[in-house]
C-alpha cells in the first residue's frame, strides 16, 4: 500500500506548476521550469521552478534526472540526487547539465526533473581509535571490478 505525506507548496510565480504524479504507482513527481532558459552545449545552468515547499519533518525530497531528457537530449541533474531538506523554505531550483554538443532550450512549463520523497535517518557519530575488520577492508574505487558478481579476488563469496 502506498504511503503518503503532505507537502505544503507556495507558488512564488504565477507561471509555476504545482507538481503531480503521472501514474498511480509513480514514485517521482515532475518539477517544471518557471521560465524560458537556455543551457549552452557542454554547460550547466540553474533552472527555477517558482515553487517553495514545506516538507514534513523526518522527510526530504530528492531531485533526480528525468530519463527521457538524459536519453534524448543528454541533459541531466548535475548534483543527483539533490536534497531538499525539510527546513528549507526557498525556491526549488534544479542544476541541469547539458552533456550534448547542442544548446538545450527550456520552455516555461517544461518538465526538467523528477523528485522523490524519502524518509530521513540521522546518524549518531562516535569517534573511535580503530574500526572493525571486513572482507573488503580499504579497497575501493573499482577494486571489486565490473564482471562476475558475488566474487572476491576470483573466489565466490560465502
From Swiss-Prot:
GO molecular function: dUTP diphosphatase activity; magnesium ion binding
Residues bound to substrate: 66-68, 79, 83-85, 93
GO biological process: dUMP biosynthetic process; dUTP catabolic process
Alphabetic keyword roster: Hydrolase, Magnesium, Metal-binding, Nucleotide metabolism
Xref: InterPro entries: dUTPase, dUTPase-like, dUTPase-like_sf, dUTPase_trimeric
Ranges where the record places region Disordered: 139-158
Name used for this protein in its record: Deoxyuridine 5'-triphosphate nucleotidohydrolase
Lineage: Bacteria, Pseudomonadati, Campylobacterota, Epsilonproteobacteria, Campylobacterales
Gene it is expressed from: dut
